[in-house]
């Protein structure tokens, strides 16, 4: 059955994308490009965005089928809730930008508040209604030590889900970068899930992998469509949720290492400029720094994928030992 879920997810995305692209073009749902960014990106102006809708629809349909046939499917139900919740936030943000022609989209406060609400509801569904059981201790790899967080774990969940949701969003600035890194990351968590005896989470990870594989050919350079916040916010929220449900939260620092570095580069750039009026990088997130240093877009993407694969394998090894 796992093979069937994978094929369904792959085919739905692969079929939906070429249908959605001309529709988005006709509706003029095109991406705006930052003028201060790399000049090579200006040709991307008008490329259809909100393409994340395709793999989110694929994930939802495939997951519902899995819920019907898989025993102990509560983890999939929770992951589906997070997918829809964070995806909806991203969709509203994209809609305001491309339809209302408001480049800001949702304000930071609006987006942050909505993400907090989704994270808190996730905790309530899992802890209060017992849809799935996970410890409120923060597991520290290698030292066989757990930090009991108790109620403070709610704060950690909010920080983790909101943080990684925005981290993937920041990384989605080069063709295929976030999509490829996400495929690698979900592959690591698929293996980890089965090794930690959490097959339902493993099935969801496999659905994620194949839904994204159906999207990747259209998202590679030169991209025919971007996933938009619709896709990137959902992917980050899902990553954080999987690490929480497996009680392997800190594994995400390595499995999502590139996402972490991209986010830190933005934070360091902002802090440095505010404190010293000097920039550390030529431009942030850091993938733009490498572009402005003379790297081609495809080189940056493949190097970052390679780094993601190496650190992901290390994160997987740590997570199962």
UniProtKB/Swiss-Prot annotation:
Sequence intervals crossing the membrane: 1-21, 50-70, 76-96, 112-132, 140-160, 176-196, 200-220, 225-245, 250-270, 300-320
EC number(s) given by UniProt: 2.7.8.13
PROSITE patterns for this protein: MRAY_1 (PS01347), MRAY_2 (PS01348)
Compartment(s) of residence: Cell membrane
Topology relative to the membrane: Multi-pass membrane protein
Domain of life: Bacteria
Pathway(s) this gene product operates in, as recorded in its UniProt entry: Cell wall biogenesis; peptidoglycan biosynthesis
GO cellular component, one term: plasma membrane
EC primary class: transferase
GO molecular function: metal ion binding; phospho-N-acetylmuramoyl-pentapeptide-transferase activity
Alphabetically ordered keywords of this record: Cell cycle, Cell division, Cell membrane, Cell shape, Cell wall biogenesis/degradation, Magnesium, Membrane, Metal-binding, Peptidoglycan synthesis, Transferase, Transmembrane, Transmembrane helix
InterPro entries: Glycosyl_transferase_4, PNAcMuramoyl-5peptid_Trfase, PNAcMuramoyl-5peptid_Trfase_CS
Pfam families: Glycos_transf_4
Biological processes per GO annotation: cell division; cell wall organization; peptidoglycan biosynthetic process; regulation of cell shape
Catalytic activity from the UniProt record: UDP-N-acetyl-alpha-D-muramoyl-L-alanyl-gamma-D-glutamyl-L-lysyl-D-alanyl-D-alanine + di-trans,octa-cis-undecaprenyl phosphate = Mur2Ac(oyl-L-Ala-gamma-D-Glu-L-Lys-D-Ala-D-Ala)-di-trans,octa-cis-undecaprenyl diphosphate + UMP
Cofactors required: Mg(2+)
Function: Catalyzes the initial step of the lipid cycle reactions in the biosynthesis of the cell wall peptidoglycan: transfers peptidoglycan precursor phospho-MurNAc-pentapeptide from UDP-MurNAc-pentapeptide onto the lipid carrier undecaprenyl phosphate, yielding undecaprenyl-pyrophosphoryl-MurNAc-pentapeptide, known as lipid I.
Family: Belongs to the glycosyltransferase 4 family. MraY subfamily.
HAMAP family to which the protein is assigned, alphabetical: MraY (MF_00038)
Protein name per Swiss-Prot or TrEMBL: Phospho-N-acetylmuramoyl-pentapeptide-transferase
Gene: mraY
